From Swiss-Prot:
Subcellular location: Cytoplasm
Keyword rRNA processing attributed: yes
InterPro entries membership: PRC-brl_dom, PRC_barrel-like_sf, RimM, RimM_N, RimM_N_sf, Transl_B-barrel_sf
Cellular component, GO, one term: ribosome
UniProt comment concerning the protein's domains: The PRC barrel domain binds ribosomal protein uS19.
Family under the similarity heading: Belongs to the RimM family.
Gene responsible for this protein: rimM
GO BP terms, alphabetized: ribosomal small subunit biogenesis; rRNA processing
Organism of this sequence: Marinobacter nauticus (strain ATCC 700491 / DSM 11845 / VT8)
Signal peptide: none
Keyword entries, A-Z: Chaperone, Cytoplasm, Ribosome biogenesis, rRNA processing
Source species taxonomy: Bacteria, Pseudomonadati, Pseudomonadota, Gammaproteobacteria, Pseudomonadales
Record protein name field: Ribosome maturation factor RimM
Domain of life, per lineage: Bacteria
Pfam families: PRC (PF05239), RimM (PF01782)
Length: 175
C-alpha cells in the first residue's frame, strides 16, 4: 500500500472478468480479500480521480473480482483497467504498537546502528518468508547503492521513528 496525502492505495484494477462488467483486482491488503471491506473507492486513472462504490466482490481462484456501481458492461469495465484503488487513510484499521503499514515505512531514512546513512525506503517487496525493504541511496548516504534489507523487527530493524522519519537497522553496509 502506498499513501498519497490523505489517501492510501489498496489495490489496482487489472482486467475485466466475464461479460457483465465485473473486474479483476490485485489487492495490496493483507489478507487479500480485505479490500472488500472498503465500499467507497477513489480510482486514479490517467491523472483523473473517479469516486465509485463497490457493490459486491468475492475471491475468485487466487484473486479478487468486483462489481462496481453503475458498471454492467464489459467494454465500459475495460476503461477502468489499470486504475489505482484508493481509500481515505483514516479508514484503515489502527495497528497494534510496533506494527506499521508499508506506506508508513516508505520514505523513511535508513541508518545503521553505527549511524551510517544507507538511504531512504523506496518501497517494500513481499517475498513469502519476510518482507524486504528496498532502500535507495540519497545525497547523504554512504554510497550510491540500492540495498535490499529484510524487514525483520528486533532482528534487523531495531527502531522505527515515524515522527523523526527514520529507521535504524542492524545491517552491514557491505551487503
Amino acid at each position: 500500500m502506498t499513501q498519497n496525502s490523505q489517501e492510501t492505495v489498496i489495490g489496482r484494477i487489472t482486467s475485466v472478468f466475464g461479460v457483465k462488467g465485473w473486474l479483476k483486482v490485485f489487492s495490496y491488503t493483507d489478507p487479500k480479500d480485505g479490500i472488500l471491506n472498503y465500499r467507497d473507492w477513489t480510482l486514479l486513472l490517467d491523472g483523473k480521480r473517479i469516486p465509485i462504490r463497490l457493490e459486491e466482490g468475492r475471491r475468485q481462484g487466487q484473486g479478487i473480482v468486483v462489481r462496481l456501481k453503475g458498471i454492467d458492461d464489459r467494454e465500459v469495465a475495460r476503461t477502468y483497467c489499470g486504475a489505482e484503488i484508493r481509500v481515505p487513510t483514516e479508514q484503515l484499521p489502527e495497528l497494534p504498537e510496533g506494527e506499521f503499514y508499508w506506506h508508513q515505512l516508505e520514505g523513511l531514512d535508513v541508518f545503521t546502528v553505527e549511524g551510517e546513512c544507507l538511504g531512504k525506503v523506496h518501497h517494500l517487496l513481499e517475498t513469502g518468508s519476510n518482507d524486504v525493504l528496498v532502500v535507495h541511496a540519497t545525497a547523504g548516504s554512504i554510497d550510491q547503492r540500492e540495498r535490499l534489507i529484510p524487514y525483520l523487527p528486533d532482528q534487523v530493524v531495531q527502531q522505527v521513528d515515524l515522527k523523526g522519519s527514520r529507521m535504524v537497522v542492524d545491517w552491514d553496509p557491505e551487503f
